[in-house]
Amino acid sequence: MARIGKKPIQVPDKVKVSYTDRCITVSSDKGVLSRTVQGDVDLEIKEDHIHVVAGSENRKVLALQGLYRSLVNNMVQGVSTGFSRSLEINGIGYRVELNGQTVVLNIGYSHPINFELPDGVTAKVEKNVLTLASIDKELLGQTAASIRKLRPPEPYKGRGIKYTDEHIQRKAGKTK
């Protein structure tokens, strides 16, 4: 049943993991991430592996086991290699600039939009591609989704902000 939850998490050499008072902390030279473990789920740390253990065979507990295994794995991956997400800005006159921790978007509105990046997320701009990077996968995904929400891609001309790996289903316009 819980195939993902039973898999051990490999911990690289440069990553330090500690688990006290139901709070797991994962750290390396890139940064520190911590999370509180709730429910009937516990963690066992052995040398270079982390095991997520379910307290019972209840369906909800097994679901939580898989959830926490994925969350802890994302924490370990984040502090060791990091995550990045790229957004592509398409449209005539659409531009993106970076001023410190503020992303300035000119995306067809009468005014430029200033989007303040949260702590822990860095940005890089190349032509019409905005690349966000972070050690926290959850925060990175939420930030990218918030920026995309400002001007989602439209299906007729493809204008808007989209993920670089996203495919927009195009529609034909009206015919006379």
Swiss-Prot record:
Q: Identify the PANTHER family for this entry.
A: 60S/50S RIBOSOMAL PROTEIN L6/L9, LARGE RIBOSOMAL SUBUNIT PROTEIN UL6M
Cross-referenced InterPro entries, in alphabetical order? Ribosomal_uL6-like (IPR000702), Ribosomal_uL6-like_a/b-dom_sf (IPR036789), Ribosomal_uL6_a/b-dom (IPR020040), Ribosomal_uL6_bac-type (IPR019906)
Composition bias, kind Basic and acidic residues: at what positions?
Answer: 151-169
Q: What is this protein called?
A: Large ribosomal subunit protein uL6
Q: Where is this region: Disordered?
A: 151-176
- Give the Gene Ontology MF terms in alphabetical order: rRNA binding; structural constituent of ribosome
Residues of the signal sequence?
Answer: none
One of the record's GO cellular component terms: cytosolic large ribosomal subunit
A single GO BP term for this record reads: cytoplasmic translation
Listed A to Z, the keywords are: Ribonucleoprotein, Ribosomal protein, RNA-binding, rRNA-binding
- Annotated SUPFAM superfamilies: Ribosomal protein L6
Superkingdom of this protein's organism = Bacteria
Q: Which Pfam families match?
A: Ribosomal_L6 (PF00347)
The record's subunit annotation is:
Part of the 50S ribosomal subunit.
The family line of this record is: Belongs to the universal ribosomal protein uL6 family.
Q: What does this protein do?
A: This protein binds to the 23S rRNA, and is important in its secondary structure. It is located near the subunit interface in the base of the L7/L12 stalk, and near the tRNA binding site of the peptidyltransferase center.
Q: Which gene carries the instructions for this protein?
A: rplF
